A protein has these predicted regions:
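Non-catalytic cap/lid and distal C-terminal segments of serine-dependent acyl enzymes
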Residues: 1-171
Length: 171
């Protein structure tokens, strides 16, 4: 093994911000046997908005043609593994425990409403969700503050001579 890392679920984390937050949540739920912890900052939980997208937006990433090139047929995204809510419902129905979730979003972020909705959805399913809101928008000032909170939330060995790690790195 080139890197002596733990392969245990409880030692494996995934995180992202904005569209990467969506990706971390989606992949963390899809690969729930791999990831024990998921963190999403200002996550782009905008699948409902995609169903009504057209090509009139000045922002390329909001255009229907762009979204279809990434996600495929937008009329089908609510009932497939692209949708984190669908994945979570499927896990719940099968009795699969959820990874621990940390979600945070700025009070001035346009993604605040969908993040609150996803938090509520996961709480209703009984997931272990740590959720925070604070001053800021969809910007690095917010993410820089909250990534530190993510690191504090994760089960890391903060006193190791090897630096911040899971405590499962063998040198």
């Amino acid at each position: 093994r080139m890197f002596p890392l733990s392969h245990k679920k409880e030692d494996t984390f995934i995180a992202g911000l904005s569209m990467g937050g969506y990706g971390a949540i989606r992949n963390g739920l899809k690969y729930h046997d791999t990831f024990g912890y998921i963190a999403g900052l200002s996550s782009a939980m905008i699948l409902e908005k995609m169903n009504v997208a057209d090509d009139s937006s000045p922002m390329f990433f909001e255009r229907k043609s762009f979204l279809e090139s990434v996600f495929g047929d937008l009329s089908k995204i609510s009932d497939c593994e692209i949708n984190p809510e669908w994945l979570a419902r499927d896990m719940k129905e099968k009795g699969i425990p959820f990874p621990h979730l940390y979600l945070a979003c700025g009070l001035d972020d346009p993604l605040l409403p969908p993040n609150r909705k996803f938090r509520d959805f996961m709480n209703e399913l009984g997931a272990d969700v740590t959720y925070e809101e604070g001053p800021g928008a969809h910007e690095w000032d917010f993410w820089n503050r909250y990534i530190k909170k993510v690191l504090d939330w994760l089960p890391l060995d903060k006193d190791s001579k090897e630096g911040l790690n899971s405590g499962n790195v063998g040198l």
